[in-house]
């Protein structure tokens, strides 16, 4: 489900890849992308074939970004927890955190505890354009 609080980087008939307008981590620490299905899917185990496909697309996106020297490594995290927020219901989605070259490999993402407490600027337009072009030409599913 494509969020109006995100910028679309890539889509096909099944999935979208977006970058949040207010990402979970500052851009100096890395990038934040979200892979989300276009179907109503509350959890990965609700449709294991589809969720496996979504993880494959997320891994391929990471491979493309690594080859393009955008980030040397990534944290990939699956969520379906937004039903915890008022007015929201759970939906399956995958977060990709491209990590900064200066970070120690394996360093975990540290997120604030409360929702709506991220105060980070969006990915720069030039970098969004670069990813759009890379994904358009190289991310085939």
Cite the ranges covered by each PLM segment.
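HIT superfamily nucleotide-processing domains
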Residues: 1-141
């Amino acid at each position: 489900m494509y969020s109006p609080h995100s910028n679309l980087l890539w889509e096909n008939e099944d999935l979208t890849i977006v970058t949040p307008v207010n990402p979970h981590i500052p851009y100096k620490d890395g990038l934040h992308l979200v892979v989300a299905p276009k179907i109503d899917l509350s959890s990965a185990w609700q449709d294991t074939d589809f969720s496996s496909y979504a993880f494959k697309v997320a891994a391929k996106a990471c491979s493309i970004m690594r080859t393009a020297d955008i980030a040397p490594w990534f944290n990939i995290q699956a969520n379906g927890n937004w039903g915890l927020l008022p007015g929201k219901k759970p939906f399956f989605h995958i977060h990709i955190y491209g990590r900064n070259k200066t970070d120690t490999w394996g360093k975990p993402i540290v997120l604030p505890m409360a929702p709506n407490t991220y105060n980070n600027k969006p990915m720069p337009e030039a970098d969004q354009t670069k990813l759009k072009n890379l994904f358009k030409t190289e991310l085939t599913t």
